């Protein structure tokens, strides 16, 4: 489901700095004919996207992106992307593998109010069990009936059962409000600790996915600070990155343990 890992994406580089997103990765074994069939664009830079569409025109089959991560996009951005896509005869596809379900049953698109043609969901949808879903409008999905689609695990019902149970639980327990309240409490307590330290750091982002941001005039220091943070938190028994992913099984005690660490 995640759009960035098409085979052709192995040839992509960050359009802002020309670097591949993962150090040490090469497009080994990927046919050279696929190079250039996926084109990266800069998130929230609508001029950059429009320029690419003007250059490639009807060759653009779809615009695919994560609608958001830890921060909401600027107001109107996704509406503009959808308008550009449809004006060009292209599909709009959202990757909600990470941002879907925690924020809202229905995904970030429900919160933001922009419905794409196709969406990929996974992860929180099934509470960690292996499960993914590709959903969309009839017009977008109907061609699959004329395509070769196969699977080795058609009969696996565990992921389906886990997803059904998870979605029912989220709906019956007002998950949107729970994540809002829990995330804001977490951010408040972590901020108090940060404010009392000598480290230039802050916590920001939406309540369902707060993110710790280290600040330094030397950009090369930031990855080292992140690594040190993860290492020292692990020593205190808290296994995490610099992004929090609350679940409804977490308690106030878990926040206190994190803050003490």
Task: Explain the meaning of each model-derived region.
Residues 48-52, 65-91:
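Active-site core of PLP-dependent enzymes with the aminotransferase class I/II
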Residues 50, 146-156:
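A short glycine-threonine-serine/GTX helix/turn-capping micro-motif
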Residues 183-187, 191-229:
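Conserved PLP-binding catalytic core of the aspartate aminotransferase-like
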Residues 112-144, 155-162:
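Active-site PLP attachment segment
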Residues 171-173, 232-261:
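PLP-dependent enzyme catalytic core of the Aspartate aminotransferase-like
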Residues 87-89, 197, 236:
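Helix C-cap/helix->beta junction micro-motif
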Residues 1-59, 184:
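PLP-dependent aspartate aminotransferase-fold enzymes
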Residues 166-188, 219:
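Structural signature of PLP-dependent enzymes
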